[in-house]
Amino acid sequence: MNYMDDASTFERSFLQKARQQHIPITGALELLPLCNMNCDMCYVRLSRSEMECQGQLRTVDEWILLAQQMQKAGTLFLLLTGGEPLLFPDFKTLYLELRNMGMILTINTNGTLLDESWADFFAEYRPRRINITLYGADAASYNRLCHYPQGFDQTVRAIRLLRERNDDVKISCSVTKKNAHDFPKIFVLGEKLGVPVHADHYMMPAVRERSFPFDAQVRLNPEDAAALALQTLKLQLASDIFRQYVHESIHRVNNPSFPRGNGHISCLAGNCSFFINWHGFLFPCVMLSEISAPVFDLGFISAWEKVSAAAQKISLSSQCCQCRLQPICRTCVAAAFLETSSYRGMPGYLCRYSEHYYHLLLAEEASFSSIAL
């Protein structure tokens, strides 16, 4: 979760000040692990019987009491996620209580349950934004990846219902081997619906509560992931801005004086951002579950202080910090740990990703020169 990706200038100012003071201004609540779909790459989804073997859901009253502690600690932005958050009992009660506290709310949903009634609710009590994940461009892709063929039509319908009511919607797309061919179609669909598309081409090998290992065969190989990432930017950016991005990226790689950081967490995680899972453990981010504190037992402020302090102590390897490709690399401490089982490990997948991405940037720059001639 990176709130900065979609933050306005005003929000960025808030976030940066909170980061400097280690105020937990933004967070995410994973309300439950249940979902009506069963996507191959999901690291959260459990069946009801699997969930009950691990524990019970927190009640709406527990979440409200915790949110009151968050409010006192300075939390302003909250993401509600799951699983499928609309399956959470008393979701509307929790949502309205958080809204009445002044929280600025965003929702992650697969959209399949979002009918006219839900759309009317969100039109009356608007969130900041609703992020809807689109897993493919047709029913066949939904069947292959999510084992839920009707999901495509249901999701597109949900997007239309929300846009008809002028709600802010963003399409998220997790690109895998089973739906990579759909991405250009998803981008076109987003344009037709008047909704921006965010595609995630790098899939961290997370497992979390699921009892079986990550299916490495689902994610793209690093070269394909890098190619799709650059293709996405080319589709989304105006040609002059894309050229500028290519030139600046190459310059940063080849400029030894360009800052490469000290290897410590450079995003918001543990600095001013947190994630709380359905069990009630607070993490710096959804992918850093090795650093945690039981928030319902310790209280929010104590759990935040414990996790934030621990997060500031971890760092990447010196090899990663000194690598010339670091300015375009997607490695972070969470990715390093999930790829290698060590914060200071060298994540080979991302090394290959960055190498190929750099060669693609060089090819783009060469094409600019040939066009000019």
Regions found by a protein language model. Name each.
Residues L66-G82, G348-L373:
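Short Fe-S-cluster ligation motifs
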Residues N2-R129, L228:
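Conserved alpha-helical substructure of the radical SAM core
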Residues R58, P89, Q150, K178-H181, ...:
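Residue-level signal for the nucleotide or nucleotide-sugar donor/cofactor binding architecture
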